[in-house]
Amino acid sequence: MAKQDYYEILGVSKTAEEREIRKAYKRLAMKYHPDRNQGDKEAEAKFKEIKEAYEVLTDSQKRAAYDQYGHAAFEQGGMGGGGFGGGADFSDIFGDVFGDIFGGGRGRQRAARGADLRYNMELTLEEAVRGVTKEIRIPTLEECDVCHGSGAKPGTQPQTCPTCHGSGQVQMRQGFFAVQQTCPHCQGRGTLIKDPCNKCHGHGRVERSKTLSVKIPAGVDTGDRIRLAGEGEAGEHGAPAGDLYVQVQVKQHPIFEREGNNLYCEVPINFAMAALGGEIEVPTLDGRVKLKVPGETQTGKLFRMRGKGVKSVRGGAQGDLLCRVVVETPVGLNERQKQLLQELQESFGGPTGEHNSPRSKSFFDGVKKFFDDLTR
């Protein structure tokens, strides 16, 4: 039986941040935990699925592999043979929520994961439709290459905090209650840096700009977001790096407008072509193509050219190009042209176009009836 999608198991979107994933996990883990559903095999199986999904989606490397290859990334021993097994104690799930209140915390605070970054990328319509690889340069915090993220001077090590003795927490008595709090001396890390690194001054990270090559898939549109796992800021003291999100913005095109997978454009034609019909050239993203215009074409008519639109990045059929005809009124007429048009108008039966312009005749008949009704 096919395995369920990890994001669906936790009820989060594919772009969910780590804190959203942790929140969803805690809610579901409390509901299906074996200690609360003793003897319920379905709840036990559901809990294992939840824990497996959580362990993948909170590990940046595993999540990146899963996003690219799905469950196949962990088949044939890819997870080291049962890397998700085992139960979980309630204190593991909820200790960091209730620890400060009841003194049952999980001890030393983990080093903070690096912050996620966002980069706004403008693309031309052609680049968005066909795909492109672009180089970007971003300011970020990277792991210090001297101390390798420890913050300590090479040859030295962080020292155990003398206040909390390495636990990251201290106990404060308030009347009959003992409350555990984050150690104010080491900020919960359990260690102190006595001899800080000269380059990063004990932070373990340095400010730097880096250049990345970003592959934009064909078919993206404004609002789409591309995730580059591990390309955000470096984590504190060796913690995992954050992610980089590239936000796509497609620039306005001088000819085409995009709606979903379809492209739209306006094609001007003269009134003679509209009346008599003929063949014109229209632009597409792949070059010019011929379009046959039938006689008696009215302005605003849409002509659909199938398969000349956009193929969505999410798959599916290629969109179409819809050409909207605009019949232009001639300008800059010479005397001969004016005379011919005057003769043509007379042949139509006057301005109302009784013989050849049914819409005009219908309109003027309606106007006449309106005023006749007013004078009765």
From Swiss-Prot:
GO cellular component: cytoplasm; cytosol; membrane; protein-containing complex
Annotated consequence of substituting C197S: Loss of DnaK-independent chaperone activity
Origin: domain of life: Bacteria
Zn finger (CR-type) start-end: 131-209
Impact noted for substituting C164S: Loss of function
Location of this chain's protein in the cell: Cytoplasm
Entry keyword set: Chaperone, Cytoplasm, DNA replication, Metal-binding, Repeat, Stress response, Zinc, Zinc-finger
HAMAP family in the record: DnaJ
Domain notes: The J domain is necessary and sufficient to stimulate DnaK ATPase activity. Zinc center 1 plays an important role in the autonomous, DnaK-independent chaperone activity of DnaJ. Zinc center 2 is essential for interaction with DnaK and for DnaJ activity.
Protein name from the UniProt record: Chaperone protein DnaJ
